[in-house]
Amino acid sequence: MARFSSAEVLDAVLRYPVVPVFYHADVAYAKRILQACYDGGLRVFEFTNRGANAFDVFSQLQTFVQEQCPDMLLGIGTIYTAQDAERFIEAGADFVVQPVTTAEVAAACQHNDVAWLPGAMTLNEVYNATQLGAKLVKIFPGNVVGPGYIKALRGPMPNVKLMVTGGVEPTNESVSEWFGAGVNVVGMGSQLFKNADDTQALVAQISGLMQFVNSLPK
């Protein structure tokens, strides 16, 4: 089961608002990436349920985190069903991320006091997610709507916590634009891991990025 309550996870995500979104079928490689993210200063990591052996890899990563990266929150992404949510929660998922919003997954997370991050795009979808209890809503895909959309959404919904994924680049310019538009958290996938084979370079890149993010006005 999760090591942290839903409220504790939400607080941590807002304090460490850069979330890597990652999947790889090779456990050893996934461990190296997770360790590099940890060494670079990240404390929230989303492993996605996108491969046939995702559960096995996730389970081994969870053990690795508890032994080597105890302050890292490890969550599972790309969850569509309550059955999958329950399975990964049982394996220790600290949070559950969806590309969509389903009441069944919301209920499974809430029953276990596990943070639930549903996916939405339209104003109506964001509102419906909050009505189901979401404290942080994922806007996806970000590259389709752009930062201008976030600014517009903030007009009628100034208080909803938002995380954007898809199209966020690991550059000062990109993250400054998104945070300036009003997001609370950014998720980064393939853009962050383009040269991931060089883990020392990845650590340095993440460290510099986190220093910049922490310098932005809150």
Task: Describe each model-derived feature in a short phrase.
Residues 81-91, 125-132, 149, 168-186:
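Catalytic cores of alpha/beta
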Residues 49-50, 79, 100-102, 121-122, ...:
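Short, ordered loop/turn segments at secondary-structure junctions
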Residues 38-43, 89-96, 111-117, 131-136, ...:
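Glycine-enriched alpha-helix->loop->beta-strand junction motifs that scaffold or abut catalytic
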Residues 99-145:
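Histidine/lysine/aspartate-rich catalytic loop segments that bind and position anionic ligands
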Residues 95-105, 139-146, 182-202:
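Glycine-rich phosphate-binding active-site loops on the catalytic face of alpha/beta enzymes
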